[in-house]
A protein has these predicted regions:
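Ser/Thr-rich, low-complexity intrinsically disordered terminal regions
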Residues: 1-121
Length: 121
């Protein structure tokens, strides 16, 4: 199962709902369908070319000692042993969309570059 994680940290304190709302252009760019949403969490489905290429995106606002962060997890059934090429492409697109549309929340961690979990997780 493929799993990619990114952590975003707002430059100024934001409410959880505002952090999730800032993701709207990213969700639209990924053509993600929101399945469940609360003030601090959302889950969405991203459909590729069939059931085997279906991906899930989870966004969770987490309280840390130095403030709130937004964690985004992209999951698919694609095998990581094959480097999960389709999931990796969606992950790269997600990173581009975040950089383009969410500059107020800089990326502080990405699992493909920094390891499986953030330090202190």
């Amino acid at each position: 199962m493929a799993r990619f994680l990114v952590v975003l940290k707002p430059g100024v304190p934001l409410a959880a709902a505002a952090m999730l709302e800032a993701l709207q252009p990213v969700l639209e760019g990924l053509r993600a369908e929101i399945e469940h949403r609360t003030p601090a969490h959302l889950s969405a489905m991203i459909r590729g070319g069939g059931e085997s290429q279906r991906m899930q995106l989870f966004a969770d606002v987490q309280s840390k000692t130095d403030g709130k962060v937004l964690e985004l997890v992209l999951l698919s059934r694609e095998a990581m042993g094959t480097t999960a090429p389709q999931t990796r492409e969606v992950f790269k697109l997600m990173l581009e969309l975040i950089q383009q549309h969410v500059p107020s929340m800089p990326l502080t961690f990405r699992s493909d570059r920094d390891g499986p979990l953030p330090t202190g997780a």
